[in-house]
Amino acid sequence: MNNYHFQEHHLLLRDQVRRMVEKHVAPIASEIDENNRFPEELVEIFGDMGLLQLWVPEEYGGPGADLTSVCLVKEEIAKVSESAALLAANNSFGLILPILNFGTEEQKRHYLGLSAKGRTLTAVAITEPGTGSDVSSMKTRAVQDGASWVLNGGKIYITFGSVAHFILVFARTSEGKGANGISAFIVDTKTPGFSFGKEDRKMGIRGVPNVPIFFDNVRVPAENMIGPEGQAFKTCMRILDLNRPTVGATAVGLAQGAIDVSTAYARERNQFGRPIAEFQGIQFMLADMQMQTEAARCMLYDCTRMADREEWDGFSAKASMVKCFASDTAMKVTTDAVQIFGGAGYMRDFPVERFMRDAKINQIFEGTNQIQRLVIARHMLHG
């Protein structure tokens, strides 16, 4: 594998994660999918390695990792389990990035300090029954009452919603202002009036709990608002820009994992008296799978280098390109992996059908790939 612009600390981190994955993640990857089980035992392991709190700066007790580090971690873990990869850097979207970019110093010291301990899980609550890509149409309301805000409404498909300690909730705080009337709040899930529903029955990422969540007069201190009132859409877009490359990293890892097992299988599977790897048709499939995945990887780490150097001009479009291209690649590569396995690929005895089921979500969450193409086209046309 090309080492791109990786520095020594990136390579050391990658090697450490690779060893951890072999020891702790690979042995349970199929089981957590089969049993629809959240791998709670990985929380402590990831936390002790600093993988939950990667983006917490050193001044607040964290590793102070950059985007390249986060993506390397996700790529390595996703080679065997996307569910486990989604747990890594769990706090980034729900707590660390919003507070780093928009929080007060008091919020940073409190919440980043908690995250740095490596035991805090978070979630983000944006999507509602009538609100997916159109964030501006959300119905969840927050009404100010003295020194508090009172939340009412509900969200759906909330990743880690049943296990999170804190949830970043987006709610409308003023009427008639479109996206500008939305604010963001950190909600402690122990707060009275907060509840979650039955876990969603999903095609893939079955080791990750997704649930609907509900707010029934949930009272949140005013100091838990992140950023200026009514400006959370800007917060959301900024965080999504930084998070989308991590989806690309997960997709690249998933694709590479599918390639690795397909290559090994093609060497071992015999038909017509020889390994199927000797047939040109299989060789062409494997070559295309690796070319596409390597192209996605090159795009990914070019994007992370931009972020690490704080080169923000054009970054939003590049992040959308990475997310879109890598997830489309993972979907195609994992489908081809199933085809190489033939009938065996359709069976749960082999991981490629799980890889294919897991791959689909990357084309949907963090903004659908249709939305990504809109972002890219608008950048091309309007700059």
Q: What are these language model-derived features?
A:
Residues S115, G130-S133, Y157-F160, T173-G176, ...:
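Short Gly/Pro-enriched turn/cap motifs at secondary-structure boundaries
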Residues G118-I126:
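A short, Trp-centered hydrophobic/proline-enriched beta-strand micro-motif
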Residues N217-T235:
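Long, acidic (Asp/Glu-rich), low-complexity accessory segments flanking structured domains
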Residues S148, N152-F196:
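A short core secondary-structure module
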Residues G50, K74-A78, A171, V187-P192, ...:
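Short Ser/Thr-interspersed hydrophobic loop/turn segments at strand-loop and sheet-helix junctions
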Residues F93-N101:
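Helix-loop "lid/cap" segments that line or gate small-molecule binding pockets
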Residues M1-V80, A84-N90, F102-Q107, L114-R119, ...:
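Alpha-helical interface subdomain recognition
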Residues S137, K190-P221:
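Flexible, small-/acidic-enriched active-site or ligand-binding loops
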